[in-house]
């Protein structure tokens, strides 16, 4: 576009670039290419690559490393712009990526896995016109930032321009993946010292086992009858983390998380050695800041967390179901929830107008130039 052509050079320099180089067949072969077989999962569909981070502001910080590459995501695999996952193992060179990907002050500079989020569900490549019309690229990052501002551990998030074998592939959102290695990098110990689960319509084990998870679900079913049992809940789950996690979803009106869409995209990690409580992490929240009509009226309230749209799905093992049982029946939990909500919604708290707006604007400034390049790559995809 002549309106933005003059901005392209500055747009390409406004964030770091990540270059991925590999045998073209690893990407595009009908038989073995991961971009030609986007439904492929697991190590059978992992391909060796070379990556290079390029920092236009600090060229001396640029570096190269070996890694593995997989597809990432679920529904977005049908989009032309796909999410990807970088895996670092000794097989490829270094066991971990050692680089200040999320800034010098981030809790860790070592990473086993990095997800390259295409944010396809809320972008110009989406098949839904309302998604394309409301593209921001920021909902999921804002959710993670908000969870951190509320005082909880969260997954790091940043932005890069991605190149695949020299071809510009668009603006991507690298983020940490909450699992056992994430626990090791953030809290110490070894990755085997952690259990991690993801609920994508049912509970999937990412690391360790879900034995303690099942015990927690069973324990929560007794909370209505016994104050003693409620007081023991802290042994199973970080209650303040649970409350604030739900507050983030309620504040942002999530449509693909612990809501009536199917109790989806819930990531939790706990330390098993020594034993600790489960903590929930904001994850894949791009379907948020919307109302039930999909018109992006950010102030329109709608009833989330009901089971009405879940059909015959069993949602009793959902963390949102634990929350519902507590919210509806336990006075002490209700008071605790009210205290947390007041803390975050008023007096400059993380969910106050001034706090939330400042945090969102900070991310807007980070990518407002970079999206010019994204629009050149993908802006006319659905026209």
Give each language-model segment a name:
Residues 20, 38-206:
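Conserved ATP-binding subdomain of kinase catalytic cores across diverse folds
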Residues 7-44, 49-50, 75, 79, ...:
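Middle-to-C-terminal accessory/interaction subdomains
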């Amino acid at each position: 576009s002549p309106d933005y052509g003059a901005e392209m050079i500055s747009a390409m320099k406004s964030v770091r670039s990540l270059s991925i180089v590999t045998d073209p067949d690893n990407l595009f072969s009908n038989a073995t290419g991961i971009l030609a077989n986007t439904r492929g999962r697991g190590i059978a569909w992992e391909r060796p690559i070379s990556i290079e981070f390029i920092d236009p502001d600090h060229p001396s910080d640029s570096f190269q490393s070996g890694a593995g590459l997989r597809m990432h995501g679920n529904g977005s695999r049908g989009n032309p712009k796909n999410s990807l996952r970088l895996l670092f193992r000794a097989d490829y060179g270094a066991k971990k990526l050692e680089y200040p990907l999320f800034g010098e002050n981030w809790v860790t500079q070592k990473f086993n896995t990095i997800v390259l989020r295409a944010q396809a569900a809320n972008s110009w490549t989406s098949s839904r016109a309302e998604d394309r019309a409301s593209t921001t690229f920021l909902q999921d990052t804002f959710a993670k930032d908000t969870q951190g501002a509320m005082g909880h551990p969260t997954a790091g998030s940043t932005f890069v321009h991605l190149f695949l074998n020299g071809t510009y592939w668009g603006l991507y959102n690298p983020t940490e993946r909450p699992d056992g290695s994430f626990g090791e990098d953030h809290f110490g110990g070894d990755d085997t010292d952690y259990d991690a689960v993801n609920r994508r319509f049912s509970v999937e084990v990412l690391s360790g086992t879900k034995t303690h998870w099942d015990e927690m679900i069973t324990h929560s079913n007794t909370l209505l009858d016994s104050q003693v049992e409620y007081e023991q809940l802290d042994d199973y789950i970080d209650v303040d983390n649970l409350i604030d996690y739900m507050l983030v979803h309620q504040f942002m009106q999530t449509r693909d998380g612990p809501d009536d869409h199917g109790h989806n995209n819930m990531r939790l990690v706990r330390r098993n050695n020594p034993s600790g409580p489960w903590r929930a992490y904001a994850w894949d929240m791009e379907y948020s800041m919307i109302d039930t009509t999909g018109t992006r009226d950010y102030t329109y309230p709608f009833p989330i967390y009901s089971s009405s749209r879940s059909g015959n799905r069993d949602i009793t093992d959902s963390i949102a179901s634990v929350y519902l049982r507590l919210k509806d029946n336990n006075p002490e939990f209700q008071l605790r929830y009210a205290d947390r909500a007041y803390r975050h919604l008023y007096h400059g708290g993380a969910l106050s107008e001034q706090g939330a707006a400042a945090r969102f604007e900070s991310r807007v400034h980070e990518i407002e130039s970079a999206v010019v390049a994204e629009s050149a790559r993908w802006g006319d995809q659905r026209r």
